[in-house]
């Protein structure tokens, strides 16, 4: 079973994504901020992380930078999910090593397709 880690501090978004990905056959892990992502990665290696940028404590950019520093995590695909839709935001996310950048609001169907494409 493929594993996906959803990192977002907005409860409704997390619940919607969790439902959709479980229904699609994924094992789902949840983090509310970047520090929780890094804690989960000590125990689980997901195939992909859906990573919000604007989260409390440790933001998505910092989280991705920390992930990319660790060779153990190099094969994990990362999709940024963010309301930050500016060209500079998208460019920064991709330069940090994200495999894709999806702006909110988004279609769950298209997001599932993007995840399938990457993993």
What are these regions (language model features)?
Residues 15-23:
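Charged docking surfaces used in two-component/phosphorelay signaling
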Residues 30-48:
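Acidic, metal-coordinating helix/loop segments flanking the phosphotransfer/catalytic sites
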Residues 55:
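Receiver (REC) domain active-site loop signature in two-component systems and cognate sites
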Residues 66, 104:
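A Lys-centered signature of the CheY-like receiver
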Residues 106-115:
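C-terminal output helix
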């Amino acid at each position: 079973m493929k594993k996906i880690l959803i990192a977002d501090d907005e409860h409704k978004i997390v619940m919607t994504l969790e439902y959709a990905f479980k229904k699609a056959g994924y094992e789902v892990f949840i983090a509310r901020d970047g520090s929780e992502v890094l804690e989960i990665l000590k125990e689980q290696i997901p195939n992909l992380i859906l990573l919000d940028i604007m989260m409390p404590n440790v933001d998505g950019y910092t989280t991705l930078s920390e992930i990319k520093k660790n060779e153990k995590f190099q094969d994990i695909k990362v999709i940024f999910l963010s309301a930050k839709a500016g060209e500079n935001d998208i460019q920064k996310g991709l330069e940090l090593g994200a495999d894709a950048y999806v702006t909110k609001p988004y279609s769950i169907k298209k997001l599932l397709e993007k995840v399938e494409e990457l993993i």
